Amino acid sequence: ANPTGVDEAAEILMNAENPLIITASMGQNRAAVPLLESLAERFALPVITYRPRYVNISSDHPMHMGYEPGAYLPAVDAVLVVDCDVPWIPSLHKLNPDAKVVHLGADPLFENYPVRGFPCDLALKGSSVVALVQLEEAMASRENHAKARVDGRRSKIAKTKTEQAAASKGRIDKIASGAAAMDNAWVAHCLNQVKQDNDILVSES
């Protein structure tokens, strides 16, 4: 990606109080997954995988906040969209109108789509495998100035993750006891009990 654009993206993300990363297809190149995990962990950047087509980040990663962006978008002040054609549904999800939005990907604006109307303050064209490394390096050069902000955000995210885990366990326990009908979380829980490390899950919908 263009170095000047990468620097601008780094500045946006490092100055943000409530940044968010949204992706769907980045994991098509498996080499990008550890790069995103490294970036998110280092700078306490929460990640939403919205309607994912691939594994983009480990489900138990401390910065993986789930699959729905709606609860986060009203408060975000910066969004990094990585290899994602539809990062949210405008009629359902309300983005903070003052948020800066950066799109990153080989075709960040999906120019072949007849209609696509998402805000964009900066478009970075390039492979996510290359651009994520560039972005981490650019953000690292600003790291000392944002340490307190990043540390505070990390603590807040850890608390939210703990609450998410407790709610998920409560829901699964309720279903297991027969007090509630099974849902997607229950199916995922059951699959997780039987799958092996090298198993491949295919979702057809």
Question: Which stretches of residues belong to each language-model region?
Answer:
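Active-site diphosphate/adenylate-binding microenvironment
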Residues: 158-205
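A general structural motif
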Residues: 1-10, 182-183, 205
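Glycine-rich, acidic loop regions that bind phosphate or pyrophosphate groups
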Residues: 49-160
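Generic amphipathic alpha-helical segments used as scaffolds and interaction surfaces in large
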Residues: 23, 27-30, 122, 126, ...
